[in-house]
């Protein structure tokens, strides 16, 4: 990925987080979880560190289905149950609308 593409991703991620904020005041029952959006980027960890880390708190490389995914644990979400899941899904959905390949990483606590 070029620096310009990475900067665009950082911008798109902020927009996706703003989109997910609509779920901030919803119920938060259900199982406590670590659900987080994930995105496939053609970038190295060094590129992510330089360009996108200010927009993110944590990045995790995780092989899934033979592909490299960055799990966005630091994406802005609230809650620890259903609300967290809804916000993670909303971020993933919005990034997909921006033409990124996305999924949601689901993990119960």
At which residue positions do the language-model features occur?
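A short alpha-helix capping/helix-coil boundary motif
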Residues: 64-65, 69-72
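N-terminal leader/targeting segments
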Residues: 1-65
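Short, compact, well-ordered microdomains
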Residues: 71-109
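Charged, low-complexity intrinsically disordered segments
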Residues: 40, 45, 69, 105-108
């Amino acid at each position: 990925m070029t620096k310009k593409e990475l900067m665009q991703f950082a911008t798109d991620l902020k927009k996706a987080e703003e989109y997910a904020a609509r779920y901030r005041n919803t119920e938060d029952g259900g199982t406590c979880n670590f659900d987080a959006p994930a995105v496939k980027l053609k970038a190295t960890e060094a590129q992510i560190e330089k360009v996108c880390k200010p927009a993110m708190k944590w990045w995790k490389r995780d092989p899934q289905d033979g592909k490299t995914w960055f799990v966005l644990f630091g994406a802005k979400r609230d809650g620890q149950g259903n609300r967290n899941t809804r916000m993670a899904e909303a971020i993933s959905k919005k990034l997909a609308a921006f033409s990124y390949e996305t999924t949601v990483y689901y993990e119960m606590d």
